[in-house]
């Protein structure tokens, strides 16, 4: 199982069967609308961003209360873009261990684009 399979609709049933909450919105449509009409660029692509602000936006997209994702830009540690975002189509896996011992597993798909905030990376600038 690979995160990128979810985006293509492959193995979605297998992920759900194993207890992963998948995006309930059309990831590609949100990506296209965000690219055409961006509303949020977030500077700082670390774990706190992925686990909290991106997860909250993911819930808003799942509920239909919002229709665009977030573009994340990293201005310090560019390796996170190259190793944690782009190889996985900007998808993340959020895993929370609850006080009851339950494990909550969610695929976060609200990040639609990941960029290096540095003019030396012309394609991102």
Predicted regions and their residues:
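Non-transmembrane, aqueous-exposed alpha-helical and coiled segments at domain scale
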Residues: 1-125
């Amino acid at each position: 199982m690979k995160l990128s399979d979810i985006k293509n609709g492959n193995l979605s049933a297998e992920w759900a069967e194993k207890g992963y909450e998948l995006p309930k919105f059309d990831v590609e449509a949100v990506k296209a609308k965000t690219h055409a009409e961006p509303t949020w660029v977030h500077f700082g692509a670390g774990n706190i961003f992925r686990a909290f602000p991106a997860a909250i936006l993911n819930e808003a997209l799942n509920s239909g209360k919002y229709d665009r994702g977030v573009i994340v830009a990293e201005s310090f540690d560019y390796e996170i873009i190259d190793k944690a975002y782009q190889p996985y189509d900007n998808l993340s896996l959020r895993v929370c261990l609850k006080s009851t011992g339950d494990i909550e597993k969610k695929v976060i798909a609200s990040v639609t684009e990941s960029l290096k905030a540095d003019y030396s990376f012309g394609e991102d600038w």
